[in-house]
Amino acid sequence: MVLSTAINKFMYLTVQERFGNTFRVGYSRTELAENRQAIQHPIVRACLEELGIEKGLEIVSIADIPSKTGLGSSSSFTVGLLHALHALQGHSVSAQRLADQACQIEIHRLREPIGKQDQYIAAYGGFQLIQFQPNGEVFVDPVVWSRATRLELQRRLILFFTGITRDAREILSRQTETTCNHLTELCHLCQIARQMRDVLTSGKDLNDFGRLLHDAWEIKKGLEITISNSRIDDCYQRALKAGALGGKLLGAGDGGFLLFFCEPHHQDRLREALADLVEVPFSFESQGSKVIYVGDDRG
């Protein structure tokens, strides 16, 4: 179980039919492939296979945030590409199906050692309590809270980029291998997720959210030694001394973005303490993946 939110940092994808069966795929590099099987980008190739598309396409992606930074860009890419391909075929698709299909591709087809959180929040958007069942089912429960609480929480959250990028697969593989050794800690993290949701929905002292964020980070660090490192620990301690009540490293660990909960009157001091990091302004995003435009000349 996790408490998760979408933010206003986006992955943009365009899909355009090409003459013949050749593909042009643009991301951090550009591929020109003679057919679907020759595409090197594993997610693009797998999405095309999943939907049975062989006719040539031009697929281009642009992202607000770099990859390998813990904000779910890979799964957002998968969800967005599936959504665009379904639209190209003239199909409307639900958030549930998008998330399920993205998980099928990343976890089962590509054997990535990842969970399902990123795919579901990318598809649904909003602020969600996401529950993962032993049988593979996923339940997405929106947090029902007041506009005032939402705005106040946003005022108290500050996001910093550490400048460190990393491949999450190795970290997540090790975490998966040791899961059975940390069932008590994982159950505690689930309880904290519920408590954090309750703080938001009940109108209780919002600072409790920050304290729970700190508790969850301390537990998560104990799950696997590579989740944090000396640089991350130093930044975190500096933030606490500057007035932050809690925080966490987003994503699998070892780099990416640090999120802190800090009351407004301490935030200037927090920014000074972490002047070596890059602050990234953000806001909560209520919508998940959406199709912005579909041309009239398809087919």
Describe every region a protein language model picked out.
Residues 62-85, 243-258:
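Glycine/serine-rich anion-binding loops at beta->alpha junctions
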Residues 4-53, 62, 85-113, 117-247, ...:
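C-terminal nucleotide
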